Amino acid sequence: MIIAKNERGLKDQIRLILDKWSDFSEADNIRRFNEYIGLRLRLRRVALGLTQTKIAKLLNVTFQQVQKFEKGVNAISLSKLVMFCEGTNTDMDYFFRILHKLEKKIYINGGR
């Protein structure tokens, strides 16, 4: 996945992931969910004016690992996500409010 360079591009990528959510297998959706979380992570980091290196120090990982989180290559653990939220004063809802929308979309589309 190519990551957009600006906020609008990131939001467009997020919208694309959500629009296609119920069209894919469970394994594809897990990958897309990791991409979604990664894009939200990047969007928040950029909005706060933080570098990947600063986030890496906050999470006690390398900046390369932060890159992988942001690209959805590696899933960020819940404990690391909590560390990110606490260290950047971000509500966890910022990442997970989408789950309700996805549930609704999947239900409307007949359970798939």
Which ranges hold each PLM region?
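N-terminal flexible/basic segments that precede or flank functional cores
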Residues: M1-F33
